[in-house]
Amino acid sequence: MLTIAGVEFESRLFTGTGKFSSSQLMLESIKASKSQLVTVAMKRIDLKTGADDLLSPLRQAGVRLLPNTSGARNAKEAIFAAELAREMLGTQWVKLEIHPDPKYLMPDAVETLAAAKTLCERGFIVMPYVHADPVLCRRLEEVGCAAVMPLASPIGTNQGLVTEPFIKMIIEQAKVPVVIDAGIGTPSHAAHAMELGADAVLVNTAIASSASPIEMAQCFKDAVDCGRRAFEAGLGRVQTQAVHTSPLTGFL
């Protein structure tokens, strides 16, 4: 069982809500994934007009909402978005995202750390999206973040675990849950992240852009489950030298 800020999750697959062709398809895919924590971009929510109504179907599904600050270019904008989410959605939880560069969407480490410190002081449960930087993740943990979310590769690229060496370091030293976010493009990527010891993964594009999002959501669910079970079972040690599986003496 995964625990974040005192809340238990049976599923270690978190999902997003972007890029689906319809709200109904999004809802069915989330149900198929068995995800219990779903991210929602604050910039997509308009309670006055009801445009792109995500909230009603998600609440009907019984999932916990994780509003994110995607679109924020600095700490000030991210803090404003988080406060807005708390007021509109009634939740302290926030996925902190600050990426001022619209081309590569790389997270701004300096602004993220500053925003995280302020939000934690204000009582938010902060889950920051960051580059796979072990030092930064430790600093975020020290200021009170409930989890860290290092990227596997750039958002939406489906490149997989490009940052694997650094993710291993983060997992090794972290005292809070490590959720691998961004760039996970296939179920095998998700399984591998779990085999490394990640506590959870967040997947959006790979499911939403699939030819069959509902089926792909089920595939990711199974992959995450198998990857976690393999990690808990204990993976064999990787070696460069061959090791005999049967004795070479006693039968000749």
From Swiss-Prot:
GO BP of this protein: thiamine diphosphate biosynthetic process
Keyword Chaperone: no
A Pfam entry, by short name: ThiG
CDD domains: ThiG (cd04728)
Keyword Repressor carried by entry: no
Keywords: Cytoplasm, Schiff base, Thiamine biosynthesis, Transferase
Record: active site: K95 (schiff-base intermediate with dxp)
Molecular function in Gene Ontology: thiazole synthase activity
E.C. numbers: 2.8.1.10
EC top class named in words: transferase
Subcellular location: Cytoplasm
CC per GO annotation: cytoplasm
Residue sites binding 1-deoxy-D-xylulose 5-phosphate per the record: G156, A182, G183, N204, T205
Catalytic activity: [ThiS sulfur-carrier protein]-C-terminal-Gly-aminoethanethioate + 2-iminoacetate + 1-deoxy-D-xylulose 5-phosphate = [ThiS sulfur-carrier protein]-C-terminal Gly-Gly + 2-[(2R,5Z)-2-carboxy-4-methylthiazol-5(2H)-ylidene]ethyl phosphate + 2 H2O + H(+)
Pathway annotation: Cofactor biosynthesis; thiamine diphosphate biosynthesis
Family of this protein: Belongs to the ThiG family.
Family annotation (HAMAP family): ThiG
Subunit structure: Homotetramer. Forms heterodimers with either ThiH or ThiS.
Summary of the function given for this chain in its UniProt record: Catalyzes the rearrangement of 1-deoxy-D-xylulose 5-phosphate (DXP) to produce the thiazole phosphate moiety of thiamine. Sulfur is provided by the thiocarboxylate moiety of the carrier protein ThiS. In vitro, sulfur can be provided by H(2)S.
Name of the protein in question: Thiazole synthase
Source organism: Shewanella sp. (strain ANA-3)
